[in-house]
Each structure stands twice: as C-alpha cells, then as structure tokens.
Amino acid sequence: LLTSEKRIEVSQLAEYLGVSQVTIRKDLDALEAKGIIKREHGHAVLCSTDDINGRIAYHYEEKKKIALKATELVNEGDTIMIESGSCCALLADTLTQLHKDLTIITNSAFIAEYIRGKSNFQIILLGGIYQQDSQVMVGPMVQECVSNFFVDYFFIGTDGYDSRIGFSNRDQMRAQAV
C-alpha cells in the first residue's frame, strides 16, 4: 500500500487490513526499526527510493519470490558473490534462513550488516568507494578485489530490463563494479 500511496494513515491501514490500530502501530514500529518506513504523527511514510531500506519495500513480494527461487541453486559449502541491491539483500536474508555453511562475498555494506548475526556464514566485504545512500562499494578497487575470487554463483541486481537493449542500471559506478 505504501509503495503506491507514499504516505498512509494508521487508521486507513487498520481499516483496510481489518486489524486494530495497535497491531498496525506494532508492525509499523518493526518496519521503522528496519529502516523501511518513517513514522510520523498518525501515519507512515516510505523511505526514499534511493535508500536501500526503502527500495526493499518496493515490489517486496516479487523480490521475495525471486530470492526464494535463486536460493534453490545454492548448496551448503558454496561460495557465492552477491552484488548490492534490494532483491540481493532479500536473497542474502533468505539464504540465512535456509543454509548454515556459506561464504558470501559482497560489495554491499548493507547486505553484510543485514545478515550479520543471523548466520555463521563467512562474510567477505569488498573494498571501494562508499556510496552512502545505497551503502555499497563501487569503483576500480571493487573490480580488483573481485578478480581474486572464484565463486560457485554470482547474483547481481538490476534496475531494469528492456528486450531490445537488455539489462540496465541507473548508477554507472555500480554497474561498472560488477
């Protein structure tokens, strides 16, 4: 609802979902703690679409389905590289729920922090120029670091797809990192 409305009142959510406002407030508190929304007096606002926390909420169900499908490829003991992005963050989170022994290499400080404490995975964070909103490392140092690893799978995110031109990314520095 928030992805289409951008701002919604607690009372509207409670009525629409058929639950109490207390339940809605608890759920909104949990979403705010994850950085997905901001609570303001009597309503909730989705975080900026440039912010990774806010992007997770956009098309959440579709991204979660993609993450579950991608998880089916991964086996215990695999070394995988996960590029930054909201779908990739959900993939990393899903992996923590379904696997116990993985090595995850990422250029995303957000992903490293997002799964920290949820697993005993070895997490390798690649270095580079830090982009604060997306919490990702970019630039030639990332490319240099990547060349030092062999992985079983490499998962990347994309901002769009067109059948004529293929995949696209609105951030050239992020696109060049992978």
Describe each region flagged by the PLM.
Residues 83, 106, 156-157:
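Short beta-strand segments
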Residues 32, 89, 163-164:
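Short glycine-rich, flexible loops that bind phosphorylated cofactors or substrates
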Residues 89-91, 113-114:
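Phosphate- and divalent-cation-binding pockets in alpha/beta enzyme and binding domains
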Residues 3-11, 15-17, 21-84, 93-103, ...:
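HTH-adjacent hinge/linker in prokaryotic transcriptional regulators
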Residues 4-13, 18-20, 62, 110-178:
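Conserved phosphate- and dinucleotide-binding cores of soluble alpha/beta proteins
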Residues 103-110:
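Short internal beta-strands
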